[in-house]
Amino acid sequence: MPAFKPERVLVLGIGNVLWADEGFGVRCVERMAETHALPANVRLLDGGTQGLYLLPFLEEAEALIVFDAVDFGFTPGTLVTMRDDDVPAFMGAKKMSLHQTGFQDVIATAQLMGYCPSRMTLIGCQPVELEDYGGSLRPAVAGQIDFAIAEAVRELRAWGIEVTKGATISNDLVDPSLARDAYERGRPSEDEACRIGDHRFFPSAAKVRA
């Protein structure tokens, strides 16, 4: 029997699917629901960029697994796993967006209130591109989704939680209109909808379009 066997686990994906690789975490939980059957005590949640609104979910969990795009300073597409005290430290070391600052605050607040999960695991991927509004995950990052899920499954099994191939029904995931397949098919092209900024305000955009 494992030394640590949590009764309630939160598997959380955070980020913004509208900003290219920043959607990595959300796409991981979406994919995990499609490929693995999780027991009732494991909750899959698309946390998006909700910040402190995620606090009640952390309060309920004894263990936490977080998927996110994190700037570790490594080669783009590199997958990294951090645990426990290293999780808030790495999420705040080099902030890429407001959602990371917000999630740091969530962890700090949960710790102050005495409700922080006793085990935390961050499965992060070094992004390639974050400035493409409406863009897709880059191949180097998208290619790490299944490996990130496999790492989460290993972590869950190490905690004594049974995970099998299958599917998990959850009401806590991305809206179907923003699911990856629908998003990719329904998104307008770059010619139809500029994704690099209005040239009236962003000189770099004008140079690219010239």
Swiss-Prot record:
CDD domains: H2MP_MemB-H2up (cd06062). Keywords: Aspartyl protease, Hydrolase, Metal-binding, Nickel, Protease. It comes from the Bacteria. Ni(2+) binds at E22, D68, H99. The keyword Hydrolase applies. The keyword Iron-sulfur does not apply. One of its GO terms (biological process) is protein processing. GO terms for molecular function: aspartic-type endopeptidase activity; enzyme activator activity; metal ion binding. Coiled coil: none annotated. InterPro entries: Pept_A31_hyd_express (IPR004419), Pept_HybD-like_dom_sf (IPR023430), Peptidase_A31 (IPR000671). NCBIfam families: hupD (TIGR00140), hydrog_prot (TIGR00072). Not known. Could be involved in the processing of hydrogenase. PANTHER family: HYDROGENASE 1 MATURATION PROTEASE, HYDROGENASE 2 MATURATION PROTEASE. Belongs to the peptidase A31 family. This is Hydrogenase expression/formation protein HupD. It comes from Rhodobacter capsulatus.
